């Protein structure tokens, strides 16, 4: 069953520990309204902090294909609100898994219990710079033989640039 995991294929840490941890990256204006992103390491477990104009959250990230439940996540746009309402399951939990795809690219995926949509975040670090891509996907229902008609998704996957905030 471990081969069936939908978690991103990643390593627990890069081959060398750089100074990505504990730094805040300020992001350029974007459709998601994300303002800052930071990556921290607490007791060997990565945590991602995200902030928008209205809210903020810190997510504990599961490693090695494990998913960790988080109680809070940002109010991300969802592709198909009607299906999300039909399959709502009660108290919302946000399951997060990820890790290092390379020495400079941290990937994490957020799947919520009441959404059919899920988001994958690709964080590419380059010195003082960060390139972030947020990819939104709709969970395919295996029992459906026909494609579910969708509206065009107004949030295209595109690169969001960020710059490391200088220490005061």
What are these regions, as identified by a protein language model?
Residues 1-168:
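Peripheral terminal and inter-domain segments
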